[in-house]
From Swiss-Prot:
The gene is ileS. Transmembrane segments: none annotated. It comes from Helicobacter pylori (strain Shi470). IleRS has two distinct active sites: one for aminoacylation and one for editing. The misactivated valine is translocated from the active site to the editing site, which sterically excludes the correctly activated isoleucine. The single editing site contains two valyl binding pockets, one specific for each substrate (Val-AMP or Val-tRNA(Ile)). PANTHER family: ISOLEUCINE--TRNA LIGASE, MITOCHONDRIAL (PTHR42765:SF1), SOLEUCYL-TRNA SYNTHETASE (PTHR42765). This is Isoleucine--tRNA ligase. Its cofactor is Zn(2+). Belongs to the class-I aminoacyl-tRNA synthetase family. IleS type 1 subfamily.
Length: 920
């Protein structure tokens, strides 16, 4: 038998079944860097247009986790897909280098070293070194994911030129009249001792006291109402703000009920409050809220006046319908205060402790001085005495600092804001507010998924003014001078441009290093004593939000086009980078800086829970790469519905590895079986069989499906189409049917050569579709197949292009076999009968069979190939009978070479094999 085995076309390929990815990938990625693969990609011009993906910057702090991998791999797949389509691609990775997390790292480091660093320049130098260190670490970790981009010249928000660009964007905001300094309540992180923008706040559950407090009406107010006693009942979960109460807001036109015991609440809520025991149940009088406006009550905590007002924000779903109002500690309170000219009381310091203002304004007694507001709440509640009607504890959603994860407070301070509702001049000469321009711009942007559009619209519709200033050191300074003569900022072009040039040449450290005189242009230096520096820094969201200007516009197209074609980030960036970029783009250019927004979900564990070290459910990216390799991680990303949260566990990666092996083993089979092709056969036409036409038509159909899905960035849909084809039509039908010809026909057999061309075309399509995802693996495929490289005119993966199968194979059309579906139905019924006969021990395999088919119109050759029987239509010993067909024992002997029962003599080759042996 051995001599016959040696005569078969059992071709081998050097492409291994085992990828050994964790060992081989780093070598490939190092080679790509050495050969400057991305520059080569950018140099290829196929005249199919340009494509720019603008990178939202990760933070230059810490190592990468699986969330980073998800984001960067998705971006890489999108960019490579456009590249393989023939577009000139632009992708400049970048890093967000300023901000609080790095400051905290340095402060912790200094604390461990038991040293302090008051010099801001030296402190900033340490921050810069920290960012540089982790930027390089993350850069190398991204490269190990197979991600390609302009990593030789990435953008860094701490580069001098970049800092100058950020500042110039700020200058444009100021020149358009949208930058104002205001004293108003904003989110304040006492843990960071800094203001926060809305994007820097996350909501988590928190337990808070829930109290109902009676504010007794003053004597003159009682007289106006013609009642002897009446107290408005308020409800609050922030008792610490009661010291700053100056008003109570009611709902306009609502009816308020006065109970027998003298408590005044919204009638719509009376029954609920009576059930709780807050007020008594008997109503003795009713008043319209409008008749209560401008009456006065007394704050039971400090006996100060509290004006009764009407507020649009007052609801009748919860509480009492009477809202405690402290303009120093709430945005809605603040705007109501503007309407009623209310006093803004705010006596809480940067650390969240009561300051001396409580004594000067007689708001609280001095025992509260220096006490943290949350700690003081218990005493404040006790101090209310009989005015406290009910105390409970509730758990509710409460704003927390996104960096320290500690609760934040609302605190009125003087900060710099971008105004959302101030009209400014547009490019066409009209005037619109930033909110209006942004909402208009959103309508012109495509969102994937589409729900992202409405999400961003709602956020823009409801967002407050953007608080830009931060009381920190590591960032781009809000580099303006205040003219002490007018107490207004100096927005003179000469001064602003001089500052920008200094930043560009020497970095913005000069704002701390240089005196006012040295920072001013020569024409202003004689009056330096009249100016003082603003010492706040910019919100880091302004840094990252202006990256489109610094990367795309300032380089005048060298690094891509603005607006960019795509931005792609996690869904949390609707309130972060998407929003800050949109607002700055609308100020600078009256349009969004992107054409399409793609968002992905978050990484969660297999139960759908958020990953955390405390839960012990964190999956290590480094461990995944060492266990499976980056191509498997990349395939896992692509094989998931990234628009939702991605569940991850070792089980999911094991499943992905099976998908990877299926693709790899299929490619290995294809490579092996066209490896002995005569290269002359690549250019000539072939006589393709009905079965060849079937698989080629299937290939064309699924190619359209995969392309359509990938165009919509629906990679999981496209991969499922591809995997179904590989598993069902290709492996399950075609390859099985072709093995006899591939292994046993002569090498120059026309049928076999036609099959090889089909395999070659199929491998080409698989490579094209998988290259953006499994780039290393497809690089490996091409390296191990000269035939495929010549067929595709590609020396490596970066030369890949899509092919037209019909053109490559010189076919005008694909002719699907007649009655093919009937043959497949016959095959299915045959396999069921075959399994029964095998179980009964009647036969061992299908080659022992001959078949007689009831439907005479079916092509006998096709039936023989697809059913893998030895004969069709020659009867001998009947094995079984069904309505559709009859099975017989094959009438001849088993060929020792091809194993088909076609030999006329025992232990002798069949006629076909005999002829092949003669030709050898």
């Amino acid at each position: 038998m051995k001599e016959y085995k040696d005569t078969l076309n059992l071709n081998a390929t050097t492409f291994s079944m085992k990828g050994n990815l964790s060992v081989n990938e780093p070598k490939t990625y190092a080679k790509w860097q050495e050969q400057q693969a991305f520059k080569r990609m950018q140099a290829r011009k196929d005249n199919h247009g340009d494509f720019t993906l603008h990178d939202g910057p990760p933070y230059a702090n810490g190592h990468l986790h699986l969330g980073h991998a998800l984001n960067k791999i998705l971006k890489d797949i999108v960019v490579k897909r456009e590249y393989f389509k023939g577009k000139k691609i632009y992708y400049t990775p970048g890093w967000d280098c300023h901000g609080l997390p790095i400051e905290q790292q340095i402060l912790e480091q200094l604390e461990k070293e038991k040293t302090s660093l008051e010099n801001p320049t030296l402190f900033r130098e340490k921050c810069r070194d920290h960012a540089k260190k982790f930027l390089e670490i993350q850069k190398n970790e991204f490269l190990q994911l197979g991600v390609l981009g302009d990593f030789d010249d990435p953008y860094k928000t701490m580069d001098f030129k970049f800092e100058a660009s950020i500042y110039r964007a700020l200058v444009e905001v100021a020149k358009k009249g949208l930058l104002k300094e205001r004293h108003k309540p904003i989110y304040w992180s006492y843990a960071c001792e800094s203001a926060l923008a809305e994007a820097e706040v996350e909501y988590k559950m928190k337990k808070s006291p829930s109290i109902f407090v009676a504010f007794g009406l003053k004597k003159e107010s009682l007289e106006k109402l013609k009642v002897k006693k009446a107290s408005l009942v308020i409800w609050t979960t922030t008792p610490w703000t009661l010291y700053a109460n100056v008003a109570i807001a009611l709902k306009k036109d609502a009816i308020y009920a006065l109970t027998q015991k003298g408590y005044l609440v919204a009638k719509a809520l009376h029954e609920k409050l009576a059930a709780l025991g807050v007020v008594d149940s008997e109503i003795v009088h009713e008043f319209n809220a409008n008749d209560l406006e401008y009456l006065k009550a007394l704050n039971p905590l400090n006996q100060r006046n509290s004006l009764i007002t009407l507020g649009e924000h007052v609801g009748l779903e919860d509480g009492t319908g009477a809202v405690h109002t402290a303009p120093g500690h709430g945005e809605e309170d603040y705007y109501l205060g503007l309407k009623y000219n209310l006093e803004v009381l705010m006596s809480v310091d940067e650390k969240g402790c009561y300051d001396e203002g409580i004594i000067h304004n007689q708001l609280l007694d001095e025992s509260y001085l220096g006490e943290h507001v949350f700690k003081a709440q218990k005493r404040i509640i006790e101090q209310l005495g009989d005015s406290l009607l009910l105390e409970q504890e509730i758990e509710h959603s409460y704003p927390h600092c996104w960096r320290t994860h500690k609760p934040v407070i609302y605190r009125a301070t003087t900060q710099w804001f971008i105004l959302m509702d101030e009209p400014f001049i547009q490019n066409d000469g009209s005037q619109k507010t930033l909110r209006e321009v942004a909402l208009d711009a959103i309508e012109k942007v495509e969102f994937v998924p589409n729900s992202g559009k409405n999400r961003l619209k709602i956020m823009i519709e409801n967002r407050p003014d953007w608080c830009l200033s931060r009381q920190r050191k590591w960032g781009v300074p809000l580099a303006f001078f205040i003219d002490k003569r007018t107490n207004k900022p100096c927005f003179e072009s000469e001064v602003l441009e001089h500052t920008a040039k200094l930043f560009e040449e020497r970095g913005c450290d000069v704002w701390w290093e240089y005196s006012v005189k040295d920072l001013l242009p020569p024409n202003y230096q004689d009056n330096a004593t009249y100016y003082e520096k603003v010492m706040h820094i910019l919100d880091v969201w302004f840094d990252s939000g202006s990256t489109f200007k610094a990367v795309l516009e300032d380089y005048q197209g060298e690094k891509g086009q603005s607006p960019s074609d795509v931005v792609l980030e996690g869904s949390d960036q609707h309130r972060g980078w998407f929003q800050s970029s949109l607002l700055i783009g609308c100020i600078l250019n009256n349009q969004a800086p992107f054409k399409k927004v793609i968002t992905h979900g978050f990484i969660v564990d297999e139960k759908g829970e958020k990953m955390s070290k405390s839960k012990g459910n964190v999956v290590s990216l480094d461990k995944l790469l060492k266990t499976h390799g980056s191509d498997v991680v990349r395939l896992w990303v692509a094989f998931n519905d990234y628009q939702n949260d991605l569940r991850v566990s070792q089980t999911f990666f094991t499943q992905t590895e099976q998908h990877y092996k299926k693709f790899r083993n299929t490619l290995k089979f294809l490579l092996a079986n066209f490896s002995d092709m005569d290269l002359k056969n690549l250019e000539r036409s072939h006589n393709f069989s009905p079965l060849d036409h079937f698989i080629l038509e299937s290939l064309e159909t699924i190619s359209a499906g995969v392309n359509s899905a990938f165009e919509e960035h629906d990679f999981v849909k496209g991969l499922n189409v591809l995997m179904a084809f590989v598993t069902n039509e290709l492996s399950g039908i075609y390859l099985d049917a072709c093995k006899d010809s591939l292994y046993c026909d002569s090498k120059n057999n026309e049928k076999r050569q036609a099959i090889q061309m089909v395999l070659l075309a199929t491998a080409s399509k698989l490579c094209y579709f998988l290259a953006p995802i499994l780039t290393h693996t497809i690089e490996e495929v091409l390296a191990h197949s000269q035939v495929l490289r010549i067929f595709l005119q590609a020396k490596d993966v970066f030369d890949l292009k899509d092919i037209s199968v019909s053109e490559k194979l010189h076919l005008k059309e694909f002719k699907k076999p007649e009655n093919f579906e009937a043959v497949l139905a016959l095959r299915s019924a045959f396999n069921e009968e075959l399994d029964r006969l095998k179980k009964e021990g009647v036969i061992k395999n299908s080659l022992e069979c001959a078949i007689e088919v009831g439907e005479k119109a079916l092509c006998e050759n096709l039936v023989e190939e697809l059913l893998m029987v030895s004969f069709v239509g020659i009867a001998r010993e009947k094995l079984s009978e069904t309505p559709a067909f009859t099975l017989f024992k094959a009438p001849f002997y088993k060929c020792p070479r091809c194993w088909r029962f076609k030999s006329e003599l025992e232990n002798a080759p069949c006629k076909r094999c005999e002829q092949v042996l003669k030709e050898r």
